[in-house]
Amino acid sequence: MASPLRSLLFLLAVLAVAWAATPKQGPRMLGAPEEADANEEGVRRALDFAVSEYNKGSNDAYHSRAIQVVRARKQLVAGVNYFLDVEMGRTTCTKSQTNLTDCPFHDQPHLMRKALCSFQIYSVPWKGTHSLTKFSCKNA
C-alpha cells in the first residue's frame, strides 16, 4: 500500500511544482491597452495613415517613413485606438514623389534625420475611417 501512496504524493508534488513554475498573467482589464504585433493588418494600416499624416504636416522637402516600430499597442473602444512608438527616418524622396515604399533613407550625414515619434490613431475599421488623435516626435 505504501507504493500507491508514494506515487500519489509524487504526482501531487510534480503538479505543485508545475503550477508554481507556470508564468502568471494578471487579470486583463476589459478595454485596457494591450500589446499588438507590429505586423498585424490593423497596426500596418494605422502606421501607414500616421506616416501619411506626419508627412502632410511636415515642412520638410523630403518624405519620412518608418524605420521600425519600437512598440505597438491597441485598445478596443467604440473602434480601436492604436498607440505606436516609431523610429522615423528622412528619405531621399521629395514631396512630389508619391510611392514611399521604394524610397531609400538619406545616408549623407548633413541630410540624414531620424526622429522617435509616438502616434495615437483612432480607427473604426467597419467604417473605413482613421484619425490621428495625438502625436509627438523628438530628434533621435
UniProtKB/Swiss-Prot annotation:
Keywords: Disulfide bond, Protease inhibitor, Secreted, Signal, Thiol protease inhibitor. GO terms for molecular function: cysteine-type endopeptidase inhibitor activity; protease binding. It is found in: Secreted. Residues 1-20 form the signal peptide. GO terms for cellular component: axon; basement membrane; collagen-containing extracellular matrix; contractile muscle fiber; extracellular space; multivesicular body; neuronal cell body; nuclear membrane. Disulfide bonds join C93-C103, C117-C137. The keyword Signal applies. A motif (Secondary area of contact) lies at residues 75-79. The keyword Cytoplasm does not apply. One of its GO terms (biological process) is response to nutrient levels. Its main location: secreted. As an inhibitor of cysteine proteinases, this protein is thought to serve an important physiological role as a local regulator of this enzyme activity. Belongs to the cystatin family. This is Cystatin-C. It comes from Mus musculus. The lineage of its organism: Eukaryota, Metazoa, Chordata, Craniata, Vertebrata. The gene is Cst3.
